[in-house]
Design a protein with these regions (language model features):
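Exposed beta-strand face motif in extracellular beta-rich ectodomains
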Residues: 57-61, 188-192
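Low-complexity, Pro/Ser/Thr- and charge-rich linker/hinge segments at domain boundaries
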Residues: 85-97, 217-228
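Conserved small/polar residues in nucleotide/adenosyl-binding loops
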Residues: 231-238
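Intrinsically disordered, low-complexity glycine/proline-rich and charged
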Residues: 98-108
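Ser/Thr- (and often Asn-) enriched beta-sheet segments in non-cytosolic proteins
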Residues: 2-6, 46-50, 92, 135-137, ...
Length: 242
């Protein structure tokens, strides 16, 4: 299995980006064993890591900046990046990441909210995997257990802009939300928005107040999942993060 890491980070002279993760091939969370990424311009950093799928099907990882072999900066890691992987040894995951800064309202990510006030005691299962997949991930902590995050867009698989038919996201890693869409059913370019969905009433109650999100054809391979992540969705006037 290949994990293909991609991240933009403008480094200074002498700095490098490394990735550290929960599996042997990514350093077993030991800072001295973080794996360097490669770059040709000091901005776009990449790494293809050949790994064995862990027994629990979960890979957690984070990005770090190193200078002279020392970890000088770490992205916000209170909620580690979490990837649920399939057991397919030939699977490729292309991880299109951005650096995670400290969220403006960090307190929403504390246990007082995620495990009490806005707790999700009965979590969904991990997102269903597809042979050719588009995995969309987003952080949205201000959503209570009666609601969930969804995605609606210009594709039948995303509801054809009918919010009540939106694809709903998993809270398996709450307050991060994830869903993997069958990319073979998408006709690019793709346009979509996040929606807030009331599970009890079975209807959408709010759209994100932003322009449509747009994705040109990313040329996803036959046995590849492209993962894109959004950090800290903006707050909607209802109080939910949208």
């Amino acid at each position: 299995m290949i994990l293909s890491f991609h991240i933009e980070y403008r480094t200074s002279w002498g700095e490098e980006v490394r990735v550290l993760g929960s599996i042997l091939e990514l350093g077993n969370n030991q800072p001295g064993k973080a794996i360097p990424l490669q770059t040709v311009d000091g901005i776009h950093w990449t790494l293809d890591a050949d790994i064995q799928a862990p027994k629990n099907g979960i890979v957690q990882y984070s990005y770090h900046i190193y200078r002279d072999g020392k970890d000088t900066r770490t992205e916000w890691n209170s909620l580690p990046r979490t990837l649920y992987v399939s057991a397919d040894k030939k699977k490729v995951y292309r991880l299109q990441d951005c650096w995670k800064n400290l969220p403006e309202q960090q307190y929403f990510y504390t246990s007082a909210f995620t495990e009490s006030l806005l707790a999700h005691p009965e979590r969904n299962t991990a997102p269903k995997s597809h042979k050719k997949g588009l995995l969309i991930k987003a952080y949205a902590p201000c959503i209570d257990n009666d609601h969930c995050l969804g995605i609606c867009g210009n594709q039948k698989v995303l509801g054809d802009w009918d919010a009540d038919k939106a694809v709903l996201m998993s809270d398996a890693n709450f307050p991060e939300w994830q869903v993997e869409v069958d990319a073979s059913k998408i006709s690019f370019p793709l346009e979509y928005k996040f929606i807030l969905y009331n599970k009890k009433e079975r209807r959408a109650v709010a759209w994100e107040n932003n322009p449509n999100r747009y994705m040109a054809d990313p040329q996803i391979g036959a046995n590849e999942t492209l993962a894109v992540s959004y950090t800290h969705l903006r707050a909607h006037e209802t109080g939910a993060y949208l």
